[in-house]
Amino acid sequence: VDLVFTANYVSMEMLEEKVKALDDDYRIFYRRITEDLIADPAQSVDAVMERHIRNELGAVPEEKLCAAMSGMIWIDLFVRSYFREKVVQTLADAGIIVRVFGADWEKIHCKKPQNVRTSGGKVNSAACVQAMRDARIALNVMPWFKDGAHDRVFTAMLQGTAALTDDSRYLREECRDGENICFYSLRALEQLPDQVVSLLEDPVRMAELAERGYRMAEKRHRWKNRAGLLMQALRDIDK
């Protein structure tokens, strides 16, 4: 298997219907936020939400700001689904087979749907890990926080698979592009198919990248590493 993506799909048509069902003022307000995030995907969802809320309501207290933001969590789903769709469409329409493991991918619209090979529905975490292990490249699309990572990235590395993902500040700090990870840009998705082909056509380079990714993740990004950090944080609180 050349390339896998382990994630569910939420159709943009369904999300658009939810937006259309809103009152006019809310629909316009939420549309501005999603358009802002799509226009500049490097922004974090919380920062953009806060900016738009304060522009609309002025100097609101922190409690009201938090309450307003908690009711807008679906915006992350909207933007994430938009880019998941765009990424898979871009690859499939360029002739690259994408094996997707998750719900509802049969609903995606693209010019070459035969290149989107589905698992037939939801799969459990063990099946996702096995899919990564069986693949040469594991694709990721980050959630809309911009100073963290998704476990898909490190799970792929720990299976000895090359990780291909959009970036974040944290991932840039932890990883080296082209050495132990491969970054693509949501602002330049037209370059993504060439990145995939370049990796697949150079199996030695890809294997070396995957091996370096494995060594880095095995040393720094297993769950026991996170448990150690949490235990240290708890000890610091008790001091």
Please tell me what each predicted stretch does.
Residues 1-146, 168-170:
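Nucleotide-sugar donor-binding catalytic core of glycosyltransferases
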Residues 9-12, 93, 97, 202, ...:
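A structural signal for alpha-helix termini and helix-coil/disorder junctions
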Residues 78, 103-238:
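Catalytic binding pocket for nucleotide-activated donors in carbohydrate/polymer assembly enzymes
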